[in-house]
C-alpha cells in the first residue's frame, strides 16, 4: 500500500476545510481521517454494483486494519443509474439499515456519482431524523457539482430532485484517481458542469477550457490501458476540479439555502432538467445541461442581454468537448430512439423548478462569458421560453409605423469562409473581427482543425485568433461531415487536395441528404484533370467524395466550367498558390455566374499577400503565382450583404426606415447593390454612402413591381426580392439566377410553391422567376405553415412577407436561420418590435413537402451459378414488383448481334466476351439505377472489376441478390442442359471456385427450397414473395403487429427443419411469427442455416424471428465465438428474415455491424437473465434497456420469477417505460412462477406448441393457453358471432367456427340467427359484444346498406357474405367482404389448379346465373381464366351478368352444343356449378354441359369441376363430370374454405385447413 497522504489540498466551505482533493486519497487517507475525526461505532459504505468489486474490497481491507475492534463497516450496493434514484430504493436502503440495528451515531459513506450522492445524502438526512455522512464522488460531474453544497434528493415522476433536503456532508473526499477508470461518456458528461461554472463566473477559466479541449479529449479517449491514462493532463485536471469546486464552495458559503446567488449554479439547468426529465435515463445529466446551456444562452440573446458571439462561443466550447448542443445531435437521437420533447411538456416540467416564484419561471441569464445578467436567476415569461424551445415560429404583422432602426447584420458568410481558408493556409497569426458565428462557419472551423490546418482561439469573446500552418495540412481518417454547408464543401474539396498523407492517403468529405444531391462535378473534373485523385462514393457528381492527399495541385493550365457556381472558381483560386507550378485558370462553357464573388476572392487573396492577375486578352483567364499566404495582423469581416437585404426589406414592405451602418457602395459583395438596383425601383427612398445604406419604404401596400431585373450579380438576394414582388403592383421578372436551383434547395421552385400558399402565382423561367403581385390585404392564410427546406434564406424571406400578412404566418423550421444569422428572430423582436410566438410543427405540415418513399426503388442485380434459378427468380420478381426484367446475357447478344457461343468462338474469345460483359454491367449500373431487374451471367464474378462494381453497388444501398438451390440439383441440371456453352472443367469445381465471389458481391441470398420442375415454379411462390417484401422494404408486419392487443411468436426447437416439415404448419397456427433457434440446430454452417431459413419460410408462411441464443443467455451457442456469431447474424440478414434477435451482451463491434447491415430486417435487441441476477424492482435492468433502445426496433428483456409478486414488479417496470417510450417491448419472466407475465406480455409473446419436442424456455405456454388465461382474467372479451339468412337450420357453420374458437383458446360463440329481413339484425351488428357474422341468402345484397364499407371484391360480386367489425380504439367500422370466391379459389388450388398465365390462356365455365354465379366468375378471373363461359337457361340474365362486370372478365354465353363445338380452341378446363342439386338439370343446359365435358380437346391435361351445392354430397352434375373423367370437388370443400377465410378475417388467426374441413364434414 502507498504511504498515507498527509497534506492533501483543502477547500473551505461554510467555515470548515471539509472539501479534500488529491490523487490517491481513497485508500491512503479517507479511512484514517474518518476514524480520527468523524468517529462512530458503525460506518456504512454504500455504492453501486458497477463500482463495488473494484473499490470496496480494497477499502475494507485498509479500514479494518486501522479500525478498533468495536467499530464495524457495513457495505451495500444498489443498481447503477438514475432509475435507482427513487422512493423504492431509498426505502430498501432504510429497511436494510434498520435490520442491521444502525443507530443515530451511524456515518454513511456515499461512494459513487451524482445518483449515489444525492440519494444517500437524502437517506442520511432523514434516517433517524438525520445522521452524519461523507461524500466520495467518483465521477467528474459529482466532484465539481453534486457532491458539494448539501443538496440531497430523489426523483419522482414529475421531475428530478423534487423531494429532498439540504443536509451538509461532514467531508467531501475528491480522489482524482477515480477519473482514470471513468468511462469516456461519463467524463465528458462531467465537463458540462465545469463549462457551466466557468461560463457564469470566470472568463479566464472558460478560455483555459477552450484551449485545453483537445488535450483533455485526447487523454480521456486514449487507448492506453495503464492505470494512469490521464497522466498527461494531471495538472489540468486538478486545476479544473479545484476551480469548479472553489466557485461552488464560495457560492454555497454565501447562500447555503439557495436564496438567490446559489441560483446561478443552475445555469443551463432550468431547461436542461426539463429535457432530462423526459429523456432520462437514456440521456445523462451533463448532456441535458449542455443542451440547456445553449438554449438558455439563446434565450438571453433573444431577450437582448447577450451578444450573438457569446452564444456561438459557448456553443463551440460545449461542442469541443463532444457534448451535444441540440436535441438534433445524432447521438441524442440514437440514444433516445428519436424521442420527442413537446414544448408544452417541457414548460410543464419547468413549472416545478425549485427556483420559481409561484407561477413565474426563473432562469439564469448570461450577459457575457463569465458574467450573469443579475446575481440571481431572472424572471422570464413563458412566451420567450416557448420561442427558444419551439421548432417553428409564428410571425404576427405589426411593425410600429414611425420605426427608424439601425441594424448590423452578422459577418458575411462568403467573406468569413474565405477568410478562414486563407488564414489557415497562411503563415503567422491573424485576428479576425466580426466573423460570422453560424453553423456553416462552425463546420469550416471544425474541418480545418481536423486537417490540422490551423489552431484557433478566441479573444474578447468574438475575435477569432487564427495561427496558420502555412498550407501544411494532413489527411484525416475521420470523414469531414459538412452538414448542408455548400460553401464549405466546395472550398474544402480543393483544400483536401493540398493535404499530405498521414496514417491515411485520402480524406472523405460528406454531408446530409440534401448535400448529397448538390453538384460538385465541375470542380471534381478540374481537380482530376490536374492530377488529383477524386472518387465519388455514392452518387456521381455529388458528395460524398474521397480526395487523395496529393500534397497540392500539379499546376499549369486548368480549365473549369463556371456556369453553375462561382464557388468552384474561388475554391481553385485559393488553393492555386500551393500548386507545384504557377496556375493559369481558364473559365470555360459560357459566362461565369456571380462574377462579383470571384472578384471578392481575388481581393481577399491580395489582403493575404497573393496577387492574382486577370488576363487583359481574355477576362475569363486568371494567372495565379506560387506562394504562401501571409496573414495580416487583423482582418475585419464585412457584414453579410445578402443578410442585410432582410432588415432593409422589412423597412421597404412596412413603410419604415432601416440603416445598415457597415455595408455601402464600396462593399466587396455583389448583394450590396440590392438597395439601389431593386429597392429604389420598387419605390423606396435609398441613401447609400461608401460604408452605409439607409432604406425608407413607401406607404404600406404601394411597392411597385419591376418589369425585369437581372440579379446575376446578387443571386442570393432574389428570394428577398420575390417576397416584395408578391405584394407589389404588377408583375416582376427576375433573371440571372439559374444557380439558385442547386443551393440548399431548389430555391426558385421553393419560392413558387411557398408563395402559392399565400395565393401569389409565380412562373418558373429558364434562369429565373416571374412573380405576379397582389394587394397585401388579399394574401391568403398559409394554414399548413411555410416549409423552409432547411434553407436559411427561405425562412428569412418569408419572415419579411409575414410582417404585413393579414394572417399570422407559421414558419416551420425556425432554427435554419442559424446558418447565417443565428439571432434573426431576436432582431425581428428587439429591433422591429415584431410579435413572435413559438409553436410545435403541425401534424399536417409534412403533406406539403417531400418525405422519403417507403421501400428501396434501386435496381436489383441477380447473380448465381448457371442453373441455380436466376431466370426463374427474375420472372417472379418482375411479376411481384412490376418491374422490367433484363437478362444481361440476352441483352449482350442483342447489342453485339452475336450469340455468346459465337463471341467465344470468334477471335475475341473468352477474354473479349468478359470485356463486353463488364462494359454492359457498367452501363446498366450507371444508366438504369432504379426500377429494373437484371439477371447476370453466372461467370460475371470471374472478373475482378465486375466484382468491385457489384460490391460497391450493394454497399451503397443497391440489392445484389445471390440465387442458389441444392448444389447437387444444379449440377444434375447442368449435365442435362445443352443450350449454353459447356464448362471446360468440372461443374462442381467451378461452383466452389465462384462461391466466395458470389458471397463477396451479394448482400442478399435466396436459397430456393423448391425442387426443379415443382408446380410452385409456374408462379411466384409465397416464400419468395415474402422474402422480396422484406429485402425491398415493403413488409409492414411490425406495424400490423403493433396494432394487435395480443401477438405471439412460436419458438421452434428442432435440430433440423427438414425433419419437422409435417408439424410446422400446425405449430405456427395462432402465432404472428415463428422463431428459428439457430443455436439449437445440428449444424452452424452458414449454408446449412440458410437452407433451414428457406425451408421454414416455405413451410410456415409467416415471418421469421432469427435467434442465435448464447449459453449465458439461456441457449446453446458458445458465449465467446463472436466471429461465428457475426457470420450467422449476417446469414439471417442476407436471407431477408423479418426479425433478428440480437443479444446486447455481444461486443459493440458485432452489434454495430449487425445494425449497420440490417436493411429492412427489424432488430429485436434482447437481454436474458436466466440466473436471476437482476431485479425488476430497482434500476438493474435499465442499462440493458437503454442499450436495447439504441439498437433495436423491438426491445426484449427476459428475467426469472421466483414468486408471483415478481410479475407485478415487472408490470410496474413495463408501465414506467411505456409512459416514456413507444418502442415495442417484450418483457417477461421465465419459470413456472413467471407464467402470468407471459399471459400479460401482450406484444410478440414467445410461445410453445404441444406438437413441438420441447419448450424453448421454462414456463413457456402455447398461444391457445394464453388466450384461455386472458379470457379467464377478463382481458379477452367473449364475442358473439352469427349466421344471418333463411333457411339455415342445417348449416355446418356453427360446427366449423365453434370448433376453431375452441382449438385456439378463444372464448367466442357462433350461433344461428334465422331471418329473411336485414332490418332484424340492424341493432345486433352494432352491439358492443358483436364479433362478426356470416351472411347467406336472401340477405347478401340487403345487408350492404347497413355496413360502413365494403371490400372491392364484394363490390364487384355485388354480394356480402361476411361482416367484420374493424376496431380502432373506441371506433368500430363494419366492413363487408365476400369469402365465397376465396373459398372457390382455395378449393380449386387445393385440387391442383394453377393460375393461368398470359402466355397460356385457359377458359373457365360457370353453370347457372344466380347469386353465387358472380362469386364464381370473380374466382375464375382471379385465377386468370379467360374467356369465362356462362351456361344458363335465361340468355338475358347472362347478358346482364356480362355487362355488369368489367370488359377484361371476357364473359361469354354458351347456350347450345353447337356453340361449344364452335369454341374448339378455348374449351374450359375448370367448371364451377352454382345451380341447386336437389332439382333435375334443365335439359338444354345439360346438353351444353355434356358437350363441354366430353369435348375431344379435354382429353389432355387437368380438368376440374367444382360443385357449389352440398346437398346431396355427391350431385348428379358431379357424376356427369366423373363419367367424362373429370376430377370433382364436393360443395362442402368450398363451405369449409370460405368459413376458414371468415375465421381469419375475424380473428387474424390462420388455422390448419384440414381442421376446418373436418369440422364441416363432421369428422
From Swiss-Prot:
| Organism superkingdom | Eukaryota
Task: Enumerate the Pfam families for this protein.
Answer: DHQ_synthase, DHQS_C, DHquinase_I, EPSP_synthase, Shikimate_DH, Shikimate_dh_N, SKI
Q: Give the chief site where it resides.
A: cytoplasm
Region described as 3-dehydroquinase: spans on this chain: 1052-1265
Q: Which InterPro entries match?
A: 3-dehydroquinate_DH_AS (IPR018508), Aldolase_TIM (IPR013785), Aminoacid_DH-like_N_sf (IPR046346), DHQ_synth_AroB (IPR016037), DHQS/DOIS_N (IPR030960), DHQS_C (IPR056179), DHquinase_I (IPR001381), Enolpyruvate_Tfrase_dom (IPR001986)
Q: What is its EC number?
A: 4.2.3.4, 2.5.1.19, 2.7.1.71, 4.2.1.10
Annotated binding of Zn(2+), by residue: 193, 269, 285
User: NCBIfam families from the xrefs?
Assistant: aroA, aroB, aroD, Shik-DH-AROM
Query: Can you say what this protein is called?
Result: Pentafunctional AROM polypeptide
The source organism is: Neurospora crassa (strain ATCC 24698 / 74-OR23-1A / CBS 708.71 / DSM 1257 / FGSC 987)
- Taxonomic lineage from the root: Eukaryota, Fungi, Dikarya, Ascomycota, Pezizomycotina
Amino acid at each position: 500500500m502507498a504511504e498515507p497522504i498527509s497534506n492533501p489540498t483543502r477547500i473551505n466551505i461554510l467555515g470548515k476545510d471539509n472539501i479534500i482533493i488529491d490523487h490517491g486519497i481513497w485508500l491512503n487517507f479517507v479511512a484514517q481521517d474518518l476514524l480520527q475525526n468523524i468517529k462512530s461505532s458503525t460506518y456504512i459504505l454504500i455504492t453501486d454494483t458497477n463500482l463495488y468489486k473494484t473499490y470496496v474490497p480494497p477499502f475494507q481491507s485498509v479500514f479494518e486494519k486501522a479500525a478498533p475492534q468495536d467499530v464495524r463497516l457495513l457495505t451495500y450496493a444498489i443498481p447503477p443509474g438514475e432509475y435507482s434514484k427513487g422512493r423504492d430504493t431509498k426505502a430498501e436502503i432504510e429497511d436494510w439499515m434498520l435490520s442491521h440495528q444502525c443507530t443515530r451515531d451511524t456515518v454513511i459513506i456515499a461512494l459513487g456519482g451524482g445518483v449515489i450522492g444525492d440519494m444517500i445524502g437524502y437517506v442520511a438526512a432523514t434516517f433517524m431524523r438525520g445522521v452524519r455522512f461523507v461524500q466520495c464522488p467518483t465521477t467528474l460531474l459529482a466532484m465539481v457539482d453534486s457532491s458539494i453544497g448539501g443538496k440531497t434528493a430523489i426523483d419522482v415522476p414529475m421531475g428530478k430532485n423534487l423531494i429532498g433536503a439540504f443536509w451538509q456532508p461532514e467531508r467531501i473526499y475528491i480522489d482524482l484517481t477515480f477519473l482514470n477508470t471513468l468511462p469516456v461518456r461519463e467524463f465528458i458528461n462531467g465537463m458540462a458542469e465545469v463549462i457551466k461554472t466557468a461560463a457564469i463566473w470566470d472568463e479566464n477559466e472558460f478560455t483555459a477550457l477552450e484551449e485545453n479541449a483537445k488535450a483533455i479529449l485526447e487523454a480521456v479517449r486514449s487507448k492506453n490501458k495503464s492505470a494512469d491514462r490521464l497522466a498527461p493532463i494531471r495538472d489540468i485536471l486538478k486545476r479544473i476540479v479545484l476551480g469548479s469546486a472553489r466557485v461552488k464552495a464560495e457560492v454555497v458559503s454565501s447562500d447555503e439555502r439557495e436564496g438567490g446567488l446559489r441560483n446561478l449554479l443552475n445555469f443551463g439547468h432550468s431547461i436542461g432538467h426539463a429535457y432530462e426529465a423526459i429523456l432520462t435515463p437514456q440521456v445523462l445529466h451533463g448532456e441535458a445541461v449542455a443542451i440547456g446551456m445553449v438554449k438558455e444562452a439563446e434565450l438571453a440573446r433573444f431577450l437582448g442581454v447577450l451578444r450573438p458571439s457569446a452564444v456561438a462561443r459557448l456553443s463551440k466550447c460545449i461542442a469541443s468537448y463532444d457534448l451535444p448542443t441540440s436535441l438534433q445531435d445524432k447521438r441524442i437521437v440514437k440514444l433516445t430512439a428519436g424521442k420527442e420533447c413537446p414544448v408544452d411538456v417541457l414548460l410543464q416540467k419547468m413549472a416545478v423548478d425549485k427556483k420559481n416564484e409561484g407561477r413565474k419561471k426563473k432562469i439564469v441569464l448570461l450577459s457575457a462569458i463569465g458574467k450573469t445578467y443579475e446575481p440571481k436567476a431572472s424572471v422570464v415569461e413563458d412566451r420567450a421560453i416557448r420561442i427558444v424551445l419551439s421548432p417553428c415560429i409564428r410571425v404576427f404583422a405589426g411593425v410600429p409605423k414611425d420605426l427608424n432602426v439601425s441594424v448590423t447584420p452578422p459577418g458575411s458568410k462568403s467573406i468569413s469562409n474565405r477568410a478562414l481558408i486563407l488564414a489557415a493556409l497562411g503563415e503567422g497569426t491573424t485576428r479576425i473581427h466580426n466573423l460570422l458565428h453560424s453553423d456553416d462557419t462552425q463546420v469550416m472551423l471544425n474541418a480545418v482543425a481536423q486537417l490540422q490546418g490551423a489552431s484557433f482561439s478566441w479573444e474578447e469573446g468574438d475575435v477569432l485568433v487564427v495561427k496558420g500552418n502555412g498550407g501544411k495540412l494532413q489527411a484525416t481518417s475521420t470523414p469531414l461531415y459538412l452538414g448542408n454547408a455548400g460553401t464549405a464543401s466546395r472550398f474544402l474539396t480543393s483544400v483536401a487536395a493540398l493535404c499530405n498523407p498521414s496514417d491515411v492517403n485520402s480524406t472523405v468529405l460528406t454531408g446530409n441528404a440534401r448535400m448529397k444531391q448538390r453538384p460538385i462535378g465541375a470542380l471534381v473534373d478540374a481537380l482530376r484533370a490536374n492530377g488529383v485523385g477524386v472518387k465519388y462514393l455514392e452518387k456521381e457528381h455529388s458528395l460524398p467524395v474521397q480526395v487523395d492527399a496529393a500534397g497540392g495541385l500539379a499546376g499549369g493550365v486548368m480549365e473549369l466550367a463556371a456556369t453553375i457556381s462561382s464557388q468552384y472558381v474561388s475554391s481553385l483560386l485559393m488553393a492555386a498558390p500551393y500548386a507545384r507550378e504557377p496556375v493559369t485558370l481558364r473559365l470555360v462553357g459560357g459566362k461565369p455566374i456571380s462574377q462579383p464573388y470571384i472578384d471578392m476572392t481575388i481581393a481577399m487573396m491580395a489582403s493575404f499577400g497573393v496577387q492574382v492577375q486577370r488576363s487583359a486578352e481574355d477576362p475569363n483567364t486568371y494567372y495565379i503565382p506560387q506562394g504562401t499566404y501571409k496573414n495580416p495582423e487583423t482582418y475585419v469581416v464585412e457584414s453579410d450583404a445578402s443578410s442585410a437585404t432582410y432588415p432593409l426589406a422589412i423597412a421597404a414592405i412596412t413603410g419604415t426606415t432601416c440603416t445598415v451602418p457597415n455595408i455601402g457602395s464600396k462593399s466587396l459583395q455583389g448583394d450590396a447593390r440590392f438597395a439601389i438596383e431593386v429597392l429604389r425601383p420598387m419605390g423606396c427612398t435609398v441613401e447609400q454612402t461608401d460604408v452605409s445604406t439607409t432604406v425608407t419604404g413607401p406607404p404600406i401596400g404601394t411597392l411597385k413591381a419591376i418589369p425585369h431585373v437581372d440579379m446575376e450579380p446578387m443571386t442570393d438576394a432574389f428570394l428577398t426580392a420575390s417576397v416584395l414582388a408578391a405584394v407589389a403592383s404588377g408583375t416582376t421578372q427576375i433573371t440571372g439566377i439559374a444557380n439558385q436551383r442547386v443551393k440548399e434547395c431548389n430555391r426558385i421552385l421553393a419560392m413558387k410553391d411557398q408563395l402559392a400558399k399565400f395565393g401569389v402565382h409565380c412562373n418558373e423561367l429558364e434562369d429565373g422567376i416571374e412573380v405576379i403581385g397582389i394587394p397585401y390585404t388579399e394574401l391568403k392564410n398559409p394554414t399548413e405553415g411555410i416549409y423552409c427546406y432547411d434553407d436559411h434564406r427561405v425562412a428569412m424571406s418569408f419572415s419579411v412577407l409575414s410582417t404585413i400578412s393579414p394572417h399570422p404566418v407559421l414558419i416551420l423550421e425556425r432554427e435554419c436561420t442559424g446558418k447565417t444569422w443565428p439571432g434573426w428572430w431576436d432582431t425581428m423582436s428587439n429591433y422591429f418590435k415584431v410579435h413572435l410566438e413559438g409553436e410545435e410543427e403541425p401534424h399536417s405540415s409534412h403533406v406539403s413537402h417531400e418525405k422519403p418513399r417507403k421501400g428501396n426503388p434501386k435496381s436489383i442485380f441477380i447473380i448465381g451459378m448457371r442453373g441455380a434459378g436466376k431466370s426463374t427468380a427474375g420472372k417472379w420478381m418482375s411479376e411481384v414488383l412490376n418491374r422490367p426484367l433484363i437478362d444481361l446475357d440476352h441483352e449482350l447478344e442483342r447489342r453485339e448481334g452475336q450469340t455468346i457461343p459465337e463471341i467465344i468462338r470468334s477471335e475475341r474469345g473468352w477474354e473479349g466476351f468478359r470485356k463486353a460483359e463488364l462494359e454492359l454491367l457498367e452501363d446498366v449500373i450507371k444508366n438504369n439505377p432504379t426500377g429494373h431487374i437484371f439477371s447476370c451471367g453466372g461467370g460475371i464474378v470471374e472478373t475482378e472489376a465486375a466484382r468491385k462494381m457489384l460490391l460497391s453497388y450493394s454497399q451503397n444501398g443497391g440489392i445484389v441478390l445471390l440465387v442458389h438451390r441444392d448444389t447437387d440439383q444444379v449440377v444434375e441440371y447442368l449435365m442435362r442442359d445443352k443450350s449454353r456453352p459447356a464448362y471446360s472443367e468440372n461443374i462442381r469445381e467451378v461452383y466452389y471456385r465462384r462461391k466466395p465471389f458470389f458471397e463477396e458481391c451479394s448482400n442478399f441470398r435466396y436459397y430456393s427450397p423448391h425442387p426443379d420442375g415443382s408446380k410452385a415454379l409456374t408462379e411466384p411462390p409465397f416464400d419468395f414473395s415474402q422474402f422480396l417484401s422484406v429485402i425491398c422494404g415493403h413488409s409492414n408486419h411490425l406495424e400490423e403487429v403493433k396494432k394487435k392487443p395480443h401477438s405471439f411468436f412460436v419458438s421452434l426447437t428442432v435440430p433440423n427443419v427438414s425433419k419437422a416439415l409435417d408439424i410446422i404448419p400446425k405449430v405456427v397456427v395462432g402465432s404472428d411469427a415463428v422463431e428459428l433457434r439457430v443455436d439449437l440446430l445440428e449444424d452452424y454452417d452458414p449454408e446449412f442455416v440458410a437452407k433451414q431459413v428457406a425451408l421454414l419460410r416455405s413451410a410456415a408462411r409467416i415471418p421469421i424471428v432469427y435467434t442465435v441464443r448464447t449459453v449465458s443467455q439461456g441457449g446453446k451457442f458458445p458465449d465467446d465465438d463472436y466471429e461465428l456469431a457475426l457470420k450467422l447474424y449476417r446469414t439471417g440478414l442476407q436471407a431477408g428474415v423479418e426479425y433478428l434477435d440480437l443479444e446486447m451482451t455481444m461486443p459493440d463491434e458485432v452489434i454495430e455491424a449487425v445494425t449497420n447491415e440490417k436493411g429492412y430486417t427489424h432488430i429485436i435487441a434482447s437481454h436474458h437473465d436466466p440466473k436471476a441476477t437482476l431485479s425488476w424492482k430497482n434500476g438493474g435492468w435499465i442499462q440493458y434497456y437503454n442499450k436495447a433502445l439504441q439498437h433495436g426496433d423491438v426491445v426484449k428483456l427476459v428475467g426469472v420469477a421466483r414468486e408471483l409478486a415478481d410479475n407485478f414488479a415487472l408490470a410496474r417496470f413495463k408501465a414506467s417505460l411505456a409512459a416514456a417510450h413507444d418502442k415495442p417491448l417484450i418483457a417477461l419472466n421465465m419459470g413456472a412462477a413467471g407464467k402470468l407475465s407471459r399471459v400479460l406480455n401482450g406484444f410478440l409473446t414467445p410461445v410453445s406448441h404441444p406438437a413441438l419436442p420441447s419448450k424453448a424456455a421454462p414456463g413457456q405456454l402455447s398461444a391457445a393457453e394464453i388466450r384461455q388465461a386472458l379470457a379467464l382474467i377478463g382481458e379477452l372479451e367473449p364475442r358473439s358471432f352469427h349466421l344471418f339468412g333463411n333457411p339455415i337450420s342445417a348449416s355446418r357453420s356453427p360446427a366449423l367456427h365453434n370448433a376453431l374458437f375452441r382449438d385456439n383458446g378463444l372464448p367466442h360463440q357462433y350461433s344461428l340467427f334465422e331471418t329473411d329481413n336485414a332490418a332484424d339484425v340492424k341493432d345486433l351488428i352494432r352491439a358492443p359484444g358483436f364479433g362478426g357474422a356470416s351472411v347467406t341468402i336472401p340477405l347478401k345484397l340487403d345487408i350492404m346498406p347497413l355496413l360502413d364499407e365494403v371490400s372491392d371484391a364484394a363490390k364487384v360480386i355485388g354480394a356480402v357474405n361476411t361482416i367484420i367489425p374493424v376496431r380502432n380504439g373506441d371506433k368500430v367500422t363494419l366492413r363487408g367482404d365476400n369469402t365465397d370466391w376465396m373459398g372457390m379459389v382455395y378449393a380449386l388450388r387445393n385440387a391442383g389448379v394453377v393460375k393461368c398465365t398470359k402466355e397460356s390462356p385457359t377458359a373457365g365455365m360457370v353453370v347457372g346465373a344466380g347469386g353465387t354465379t358472380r362469386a364464381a366468375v370473380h374466382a375464375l378471373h382471379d385465377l386468370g381464366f379467360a374467356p369465362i363461359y356462362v351456361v344458363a337457361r335465361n340468355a338475358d340474365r347472362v347478358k346482364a351478368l356480362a355487362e355488369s362486370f368489367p370488359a377484361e372478365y371476357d364473359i361469354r354465353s354458351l347456350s347450345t352444343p353447337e356453340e361449344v363445338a364452335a369454341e374448339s380452341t378455348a374449351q374450359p378446363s375448370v367448371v364451377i356449378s352454382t345451380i341447386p342439386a336437389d332439382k333435375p338439370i334443365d335439359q338444354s343446359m345439360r346438353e351444353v354441359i355434356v358437350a363441354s365435358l366430353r369435348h375431344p380437346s379435354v382429353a389432355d391435361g387437368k380438368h376440374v369441376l367444382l360443385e357449389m351445392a352440398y346437398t346431396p354430397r355427391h350431385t348428379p352434375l358431379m357424376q356427369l363430370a366423373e363419367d367424362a373423367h373429370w376430377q370433382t370437388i364436393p360443395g362442402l370443400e368450398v363451405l369449409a374454405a370460405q368459413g376458414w377465410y371468415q375465421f381469419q378475417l375475424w380473428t387474424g388467426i390462420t388455422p390448419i385447413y384440414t381442421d376446418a374441413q373436418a369440422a364441416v364434414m363432421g369428422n
